């Protein structure tokens, strides 16, 4: 008798488990996720106003932040590898020790930004504004600096796109 109950119960448990696995995941608002967890990987934050956020140590790899307003935001040690920051406002932003490897910063405003010790390897900075930015000890290996405004930018032991130091 116990074997019959067991043989009827096991398939039922399997069906319930499969049903639970196939339930759609609840969509989480990217801004809430970023605020609560300090990360939002592969998120669409295009055009978002993030000026009120503290994003120190945030993880935003592969996220779309094109046209976002990050002016004055703390992004110290943030991970932004392969992020799309095209046309984003990053003026006066603290990006000290941030990782932006292979990020797209074409047309971004980085005027007055602190990029000290940041990793900008293979970054597209085409047409970006880096006027007055601090690039001390930054790594710009293989970065695209076409039409970049570097007026009054600070360099100290900065690794330039060709591997030289400035």
From Swiss-Prot:
Pfam families: Pentapeptide
Keywords: Repeat
PROSITE patterns the UniProt entry points to: PROKAR_LIPOPROTEIN
InterPro entries: 5peptide_repeat (IPR001646)
Protein's UniProt keywords contain Repeat: yes
Domain of life: Bacteria
Domain Pentapeptide repeat: 38-77, 78-117, 118-157
Transferase keyword on record: no
Official protein name in the record: Uncharacterized protein slr0516
Source species: Synechocystis sp. (strain ATCC 27184 / PCC 6803 / Kazusa)
């Amino acid at each position: 008798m116990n074997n019959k109950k067991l043989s009827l119960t096991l398939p039922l448990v399997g069906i319930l488990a499969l049903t639970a696995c196939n339930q759609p995941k609840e969509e989480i608002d990217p801004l809430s996720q970023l605020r609560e967890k300090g990360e939002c990987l592969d998120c669409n934050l295009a055009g978002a106003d993030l000026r009120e956020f503290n994003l120190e140590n945030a993880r935003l790899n592969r996220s779309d932040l094109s046209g976002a307003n990050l002016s004055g935001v703390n992004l110290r040690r943030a991970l932004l590898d392969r992020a799309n920051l095209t046309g984003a406002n990053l003026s006066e932003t603290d990006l000290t020790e941030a990782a932006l490897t292979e990020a797209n910063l074409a047309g971004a405003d980085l005027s007055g930004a602190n990029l000290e010790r940041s990793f900008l390897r293979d970054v597209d900075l085409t047409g970006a504004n880096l006027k007055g930015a601090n690039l001390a000890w930054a790594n710009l290996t293989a970065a695209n600096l076409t039409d970049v405004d570097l007026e009054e930018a600070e360099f100290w032991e900065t690794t330039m796109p060709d591997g030289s130091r400035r």
